[in-house]
């Protein structure tokens, strides 16, 4: 299970150096957050929209809001792109997100675990429908991005052994809003910032300045 100190410990310094007001969130079913089950972005996208509304209730709507996430967090913020964000929602930064629960389960089963996903697919989907009332492929980042209205920056490492970079390419091509892509040669899953810190920061800052 992920936690924000583990996932954002390094990049947090970059955000604070650039005077960002940051809400660090642990998704449902993670550590101290409520909820028994992860929705792999399907349910968390609605939580994400609630977090934006919470920030606006605390700080007003004058500040631009950027949604950022890594891995399942990236999938969550990308799926949120399909919802009606407040007017101060300025953009999304998604680092190595997958396209849907079903797609990543299939990839991990076949490519990482080397097991057939055929029957397991039906079992996994049935459990998903029972626990979160949605099927594993009922919604995807591709669906969301076709309706995206805010700019999106996609980030992925070429050597990602968990989420294939092809999923980010698929997301990028589906995105209907202004989009940018940072590909980091040699970076494994979630390691792009650590491997190309200066390039990562430079491109994120440029993205912020362009769309703030």
PLM feature spans:
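Acidic catalytic loop of the alpha/beta-hydrolase fold
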Residues: 158-163, 190-191
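Alpha/beta-hydrolase active-site loop
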Residues: 38-59
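Short alpha-helix in the alpha/beta-hydrolase fold that links the catalytic acid
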Residues: 150, 164-173
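Catalytic histidine neighborhood in serine/cysteine hydrolases
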Residues: 172-190, 203
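Conserved alpha/beta-hydrolase
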Residues: 12-34
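Hydrolase active-site cap/lid region
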Residues: 79-134
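Short beta-strand/loop motif that positions the catalytic acidic residue
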Residues: 147-149, 154-156, 160
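Catalytic active-site module of serine/aspartate enzymes centered on a nucleophile-bearing elbow/loop
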Residues: 195-212
């Amino acid at each position: 299970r992920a936690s924000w100190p583990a996932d954002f410990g390094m990049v947090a310094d970059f955000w604070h150096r650039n005077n960002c007001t940051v809400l660090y969130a642990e998704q449902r079913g993670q550590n101290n957050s409520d909820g028994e089950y992860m929705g792999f972005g399907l349910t968390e996208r609605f939580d994400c929209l609630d977090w934006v509304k919470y920030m606006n209730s605390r700080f007003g709507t004058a500040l631009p809001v950027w949604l950022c996430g890594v891995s399942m967090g990236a999938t969550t913020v990308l799926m949120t792109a399909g919802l009606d964000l407040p007017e101060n929602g300025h953009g999304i930064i998604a680092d190595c997100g997958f396209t849907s629960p079903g797609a990543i389960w299939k990839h991990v089963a076949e490519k990482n675990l080397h097991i057939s996903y055929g029957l397991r697919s039906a079992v996994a989907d049935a459990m998903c429908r029972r626990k979160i009332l949605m099927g594993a492929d009922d919604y995807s980042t591709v669906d969301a991005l076709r309706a995206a209205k805010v700019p999106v920056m996609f980030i992925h490492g070429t050597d990602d052994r968990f989420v294939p970079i092809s999923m980010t390419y698929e997301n990028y091509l589906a995105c209907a809003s202004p989009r940018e892509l940072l590909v980091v040669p040699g970076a494994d899953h979630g390691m792009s910032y650590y491997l190309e810190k200066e390039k990562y920061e430079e491109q994120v800052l440029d993205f912020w300045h362009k769309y703030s």
